[in-house]
Amino acid sequence: MKIRNIHERTIAATPEQIASLLADFDGIWPTRLAPSPRAQSERLYKTSMMLWQEYDRPGAARAFRVLSPAELQGEHWFELERVPAGTVIRHTVQGEALGDYEAIWRDRIEPAHDIILEAVFDNIETALARIWKGDEAKR
């Protein structure tokens, strides 16, 4: 089964501001929903169900390949696009679920992913608001 899942939101910030937050998942991950991806080694991250390898993808702020499970083959990445209202942050998952993972993706992973990604976007907006509030206090 082919997988394609896209989330996007326009945030009133620069791509650089958002990229700095994306660089550290611990600061933006909704840990009340799921543990944040844990670094296993350089550019290798473990989640509760998957192992990701970070790689350089042209145009992406961060990009990952799914290394395991073998039945879930794909990539996911964050893109940042400057627009008049700020920046569009886009997260794309593209790949294929094989065998039992067709049902696991559809019934468990994708619904959880959707909730987690929207919460990540919420947390980015909250973190930016805190930064701006701190900047205001310094003036």
Q: Which role does the model predict for each range below?
A:
Residues 1-41:
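Hydrophobic ligand-binding cavity/cleft-lining segments
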Residues 4-6, 47-51, 72-77:
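Short, surface-exposed coil-to-beta transition loops
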Residues 12-16, 55-59, 79-90:
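A short, structured loop/turn motif at beta-sheet edges
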Residues 18-29, 53, 62-64, 89-91, ...:
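Hydrophobic pocket/interface hotspot
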Residues 35-38, 50-57, 80:
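Short, exposed beta-strand/loop patches in secreted or surface proteins that constitute
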Residues 40-47, 62-69:
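Short beta-strand segments that buttress and anchor functional surface loops
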Residues 67-122, 126, 131-136:
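Beta-strand/loop substructures that line and gate deep hydrophobic ligand-binding cavities in soluble
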